[in-house]
């Protein structure tokens, strides 16, 4: 019965998404369709409305709109050029200087803006012209830009990790933020390895001359105000000075002060940023509320228990189960955005992982890492197609190089999946778990 209900949910969800129905409505309709055989329609609709309201009224949810607003302000604040110069001053002597600079800057910019697509667009456009002048293959630079754009979604502050905290029933945001650093750095390092190998093969050199400490100092001072946002907000949250919600509000104030000091926005552009952020936040908040319906339906019909029994019926080896889950998440992430996928798969797979002793922290990083790979994979792959557009190239030319990045990034996923310390060492060291 439970497996049949799950198949109904997935089938209805896929059909509605194929027809172009917004993901929030598709989740609600598919969930209600699955439960109508068990309870009365009026009761189902009333309960669904209550669950949606409860999901949207969580105080901790306000952190997401604030971080979205702070990210959009910073995105318009002209910080990309400062970060590119800062990373170039550090990594510029490596082979393929512009490739590794792109990777390092994407990690920093993605963490600040909270958007892989924004990182791919802002940083990629900064790197593109210089890469063209130095004879870099546009397909190589586009692939590097796209592949590295999602590393910032793992490095805090991360809306994806906040969403997972809500979906998992209140996992510590501070612990998740601390846990995100090593997986995010692993992603960036995997990309750097591929980038350097490509640079050596294709003959892309580093910047000539000796390491310039003076230039590094100048670039650090110019980038420090932007980097301080991460230090102040994350340091305050992890140190217990303020909560994630309070930290998100502080991030907005900090971003506003910085943007006005840089004179990169005015009142007119600020209003547009606020409106755009409100639209984006409205979609996310409503999606979180609607996902409560799905969680209720799964719990009512005991779907997680049935899925666990099904997987354990195939094998009792937890490593094989984790591999199966990774494959499911990787495939799902290719056609589903990160936020709805987190809300759908957390109630489905988290109980299974907890049954063999995995922490909610580790599962959260496995989940987000998988879905970030989907964000750079066709057919949807938002960050991938932004990178291709910015790079002025085509999917067919980029994919051979993307395959190399996929191999390296998935190797990083296996580290996150099978070595708990990758996700838990820092939170444990900081006394957060």
Which residues does each PLM region occupy?
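Alpha-helical transmembrane segments of multi-pass membrane transport proteins
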Residues: 1-433
């Amino acid at each position: 019965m439970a497996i049949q209900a799950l198949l109904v949910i997935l089938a209805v969800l896929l059909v509605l998404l194929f027809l172009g129905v917004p993901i929030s409505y598709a989740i609600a309709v598919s969930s209600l369709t699955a439960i109508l055989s068990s309870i009365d329609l009026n009761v189902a609709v009333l309960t669904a409305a209550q669950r949606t309201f409860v999901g949207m009224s969580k105080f901790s949810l306000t952190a997401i709109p604030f971080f979205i607003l702070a990210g959009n302000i910073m995105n318009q604040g002209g910080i990309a050029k400062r970060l590119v110069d800062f990373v170039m001053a550090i990594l510029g002597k490596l082979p393929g200087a512009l490739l590794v600079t792109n990777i390092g800057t994407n990690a920093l910019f993605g963490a600040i803006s909270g958007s892989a697509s924004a990182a791919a667009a802002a940083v990629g456009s900064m790197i593109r012209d210089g890469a063209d002048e130095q004879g870099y293959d546009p397909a190589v630079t586009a692939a590097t830009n796209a592949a590295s754009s999602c590393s910032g979604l793992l490095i805090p502050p991360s809306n994806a990790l906040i969403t997972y905290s809500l979906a998992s029933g209140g996992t510590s945001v501070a612990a998740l933020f601390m846990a995100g650093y090593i997986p995010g750095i692993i992603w960036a390092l995997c990309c750097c390895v591929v980038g350097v190998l490509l640079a050596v093969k294709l003959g892309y050199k580093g910047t000539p001359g000796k390491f310039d400490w003076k230039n590094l100092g100048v670039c650090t001072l110019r980038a420090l105000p932007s980097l301080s946002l991460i230090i102040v907000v994350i340091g305050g949250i992890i140190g217990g000075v303020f909560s994630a919600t309070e930290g998100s509000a502080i991030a907005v104030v900090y971003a506003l002060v910085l943007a006005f000091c840089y004179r990169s926005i005015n009142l007119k552009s600020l209003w547009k940023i606020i409106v755009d952020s409100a639209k984006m936040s409205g979609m996310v908040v409503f999606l979180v509320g609607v996902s409560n319906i799905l969680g209720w339906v799964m719990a009512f019909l005991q779907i997680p228990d049935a899925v666990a029994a099904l997987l354990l019926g195939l094998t009792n080896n937890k490593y094989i189960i984790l591999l199966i889950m990774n494959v499911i998440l990787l495939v799902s992430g290719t056609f589903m955005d990160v936020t709805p996928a987190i809300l759908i798969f957390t109630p489905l797979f988290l109980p299974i992982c907890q049954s063999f002793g995995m922490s909610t922290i580790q599962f959260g990083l496995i989940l987000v890492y998988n879905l970030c790979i989907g964000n750079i994979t066709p057919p949807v792959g938002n960050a991938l197609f932004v990178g291709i557009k910015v790079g002025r190239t085509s999917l067919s030319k980029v994919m051979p190089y993307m395959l190399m990045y996929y191999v390296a990034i998935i190797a990083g996923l296996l580290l996150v999946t099978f070595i708990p310390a990758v996700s838990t060492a820092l939170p444990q060291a900081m006394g957060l778990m």
